[in-house]
Amino acid sequence: MDQFECINVADAHQKLQEKEAVLVDIRDPQSFAMGHATQAFHLTNDTLGAFMRDNDFDTPVMVMCYHGNSSKGAAQYLLQQGYDVVYSIDGGFEAWQRQFPAEVAYGA
């Protein structure tokens, strides 16, 4: 895959439930602590190395941000690092929280 794909929150949720992909959240620490998808890994410059050690390049990755804009740059970056399949989640955490309020965790 040379280009990331955009995915809606319903399809992202289904991929998570079926363990077909991992979810990363690239928002700032305060926003992440105030609420994030329960299975999200908080991906930052400081946690990128650990994420890459724990997830093979053939693991599909879904990137979540605030509204679905910043995630596009991060998705492209992960492709450049060698990940085969990367998605940017349309609507970001805001859409996730609206559609799946029971699947929001709080704290770091």
From Swiss-Prot:
Subcellular location, principal: cytoplasm
Cell compartments where the protein resides = Cytoplasm
In terms of SMART domains, this protein maps to: RHOD
This protein's UniProt keywords: Cytoplasm, Transferase
Matching Pfam families, A to Z? Rhodanese (PF00581)
Q: For the Rhodanese domain, which residue ranges apply?
A: 17-105
One GO MF term on file is: thiosulfate-cyanide sulfurtransferase activity
**What reactions does this protein catalyze?**
thiosulfate + hydrogen cyanide = thiocyanate + sulfite + 2 H(+); thiosulfate + [thioredoxin]-dithiol = [thioredoxin]-disulfide + hydrogen sulfide + sulfite + 2 H(+)
Q: Name one GO cellular component term.
A: cytoplasm
Mention one GO biological process in which this protein takes part, according to its record: glycerol metabolic process
Q: Which residues form the signal peptide?
A: none
Give the residues annotated as active site: C65 (cysteine persulfide intermediate)
Task: Report the enzyme's class at the first EC level.
Answer: transferase
EC number(s) on file: 2.8.1.1
State what this protein does. Transferase that catalyzes the transfer of sulfur from thiosulfate to thiophilic acceptors such as cyanide or dithiols. May function in a CysM-independent thiosulfate assimilation pathway by catalyzing the conversion of thiosulfate to sulfite, which can then be used for L-cysteine biosynthesis.
The family line of this record is: Belongs to the GlpE family.
| PANTHER family membership | FAD-DEPENDENT OXIDOREDUCTASE, THIOSULFATE SULFURTRANSFERASE GLPE
- The name of this protein is Thiosulfate sulfurtransferase GlpE
